[in-house]
């Protein structure tokens, strides 16, 4: 990390504001340059992005299947940047309901002239409705924001109202008939997101990279277990297999893809915090996964 980037990353956001040090920063990742806006509180963490296990997965599927990459829960463009690292010429569609994040993403796309990239300012769900978005106090671009009220009991939240839609209703507007990969990181509402894309998934059979969280220590373990059982039944109906992604010590590489038939019933802790990512793959395409491990 360069000295100026290190100094910026150590400064509190408010101090950077006072010193007018929130101008976009030109970042080089693996000899590729991208300009990163720093005008939002947690955007400083984008300075740390580098190639990771996720870059491997995105690059593999966009290479073999083409089509648009769908980023559900785009937040501050963390996955957008990793997608850009694979091949900036590919098409990207991000879904994000948080207004602060939407403005940031649009700026990121605009200042880097990322043609073929766009953000749709809605959340995804299993019906078209307005929902409350629970955002941690004083974190306007909260990466852990959720529409699940009791996902993390005891935390203090600001509540915003967001428009949510079914992916099946939005997809025709994307003017494409091919999806290379769907990434879902929606802090507990992955079941409803997937239910809302049933018609599209059954027709196109895209691979899906999805975070499924372990239960918060203060939350209802059996409630989360029941939701995950419904999720497994949905994937079975689609004839999809589930693989848990096992990463190396610094999450730069995938070391194993563990096929599972159910999600673990356990609380989140430091030992399992990096085991929340899964690949949902059509059963007939399971053999493709062997190539990911040998890239």
Regions found by a protein language model. Name each.
Residues 205-212:
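Conserved beta-strand signature within the Rossmann-like core of class I S-adenosyl-L-methionine
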Residues 120-122, 240-249:
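Conserved S-adenosyl-L-methionine
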Residues 32, 47-70, 130-132, 146-204, ...:
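Short internal loop-to-helix segment that lines adenine-nucleotide cofactor pockets
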Residues 74, 124-126, 167, 186, ...:
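Hydrophobic pocket-lining residues within nucleotide cofactor-binding pockets
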Residues 164, 225-238:
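Short alpha-helix
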Residues 1-166, 172-176, ...:
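S-adenosyl-L-methionine
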